[in-house]
Curated annotation (Swiss-Prot):
EC number annotated for this UniProt entry: 2.1.3.2
Purpose of the protein: Catalyzes the condensation of carbamoyl phosphate and aspartate to form carbamoyl aspartate and inorganic phosphate, the committed step in the de novo pyrimidine nucleotide biosynthesis pathway.
UniProt-listed SUPFAM superfamilies: Aspartate/ornithine carbamoyltransferase (SSF53671)
Binding-site positions, carbamoyl phosphate: R71, T72, R121, H151, Q154, G280, P281
Name assigned to this protein: Aspartate carbamoyltransferase catalytic subunit
PROSITE patterns, per database record: CARBAMOYLTRANSFERASE (PS00097)
Subunit-level organization: Heterododecamer (2C3:3R2) of six catalytic PyrB chains organized as two trimers (C3), and six regulatory PyrI chains organized as three dimers (R2).
Known pathway: Pyrimidine metabolism; UMP biosynthesis via de novo pathway; (S)-dihydroorotate from bicarbonate: step 2/3
Binding residues for L-aspartate: K99, R184, R239
Family statement drawn from the similarity comment of this UniProt entry: Belongs to the aspartate/ornithine carbamoyltransferase superfamily. ATCase family.
Pfam families: OTCace, OTCace_N
């Protein structure tokens, strides 16, 4: 467990309910299942003529993105709006911090807006934990991705995608392929799969993109794609982070695709009903060929749909946990 993850109890209130959502590390299986079940119940909201429920009416959700991500920000906005919350979205990367304002100063200014919840995305690992530790007690903090550390809502939407297509996790073989080293998605997926009882978790990639000691997550390591994909039920492709290419970790994108790109021929080594996932954005012809990304095995667009429901679940559960903690504190202060 890393020092960041050692702060995990911060996420729960005194009744064991979700209060912040910062990492999947150490969260009990029952809580992860509750998130998935709640998300399942929210899926039908998206099919309604009026796509709203009043659970967060009168609450303000502030999306604070120190790092750009149109997809994640948009799905959090939709999730909050469908819960009837008021939504503020700030691209802090182009505002105060670029003028020298510290994270702590930014936090204090955001608190002055009297928001009830912050969704935070930051390039530094641990940023969401820092904010959760220092924000006023009534505010919930959701991690929208922090450095290489965690992307817990992506992890849970991946789990919902798998569960809706494959049912139980107990008999599944899941392969995570690509840039494991820099991927917060890979870390969150590995933690969630292990907690939910998946017995066979594989990571596949070049040696230079696989972290030392990754076996502690309970995974099997493969550096040969064909061997790693043999008879798997689920293939999760990761974005090759091109900004890392300058570090000499890969000779070229073409070489990566030649050895680790998912093609129709290579996918044939997986089970006939295998599903293919990708957190996006996709680099076609680098991680995956278009015939696979758009083919019958792909559930990539389903992931986007399920992501809104998962984020609705997390927002509503965290707000409920904050309310319960506030009531608990008031009763015990009397």
């Amino acid at each position: 467990m890393t020092p960041i993850d050692a702060k995990r109890p911060l996420q729960l209130n005194d009744q064991g309910q979700l209060r912040h959502f910062l990492s999947l590390d150490g969260l009990p299986r029952e809580l992860l299942t509750e998130i998935l079940d709640t998300a399942d119940s929210f899926l039908e909201v998206g099919a309604r003529a009026v796509k709203k429920v009043p659970l967060l009416r009168g609450k303000t959700v502030c999306n604070v993105f120190f790092e750009n991500s149109t997809r994640t920000r948009t799905t959090f906005e939709l999730a909050a709006q469908r819960l009837s919350a008021d939504v503020i979205s700030l691209n802090v990367s182009t505002s105060s911090t670029s003028k020298g304002e510290t994270l702590f100063d930014t936090l204090r200014n955001l608190e002055a807006m009297a928001a009830d919840m912050f969704v935070v995305r930051h390039s530094d690992s641990g940023a969401a934990h820092f904010i959760a530790e220092h924000v006023c007690p009534d505010v919930a903090v959701i991690n929208g991705g922090d450095g290489r550390h965690a992307h817990p809502t992506q992890g849970m939407l991946d789990m919902l995608t798998i569960r809706r297509h494959k049912g139980s996790f107990e008999n599944l073989s899941v392969a995570i392929v690509g840039d494991i080293l820099h991927s917060r998605v890979a870390r969150s997926d590995m933690l969630a799969l292990k907690a939910l009882g998946c017995p066979d978790i594989r990571v596949i990639g070049p040696k230079t993109l696989i972290p030392i000691g990754i076996e502690q997550y309970g995974v099997k390591v493969y550096t040969d794609l064909a061997e790693g994909l043999k008879d798997v039920d689920v293939v999760i492709m990761l974005r090759l982070q091109r900004e890392r290419m300058a570090g000499g970790l890969l000779p070229s994108e073409g070489e990566f695709y030649r050895l680790f790109g998912l093609t129709t021929a290579r996918l044939a080594g997986a089970k006939p009903d295998a599903i293919v996932m990708h957190p996006g954005p996709i680099n076609r012809g680098v991680e995956i060929e278009s015939a696979v990304a758009d083919g019958k095995h792909s559930v990539i667009l389903n992931q986007v749909t399920y992501g809104i429901a998962v984020r609705m679940a997390v927002l509503s559960m965290a707000m409920s946990g904050q309310n319960a903690q506030r009531q608990f504190d008031q009763e015990n202060a009397q």
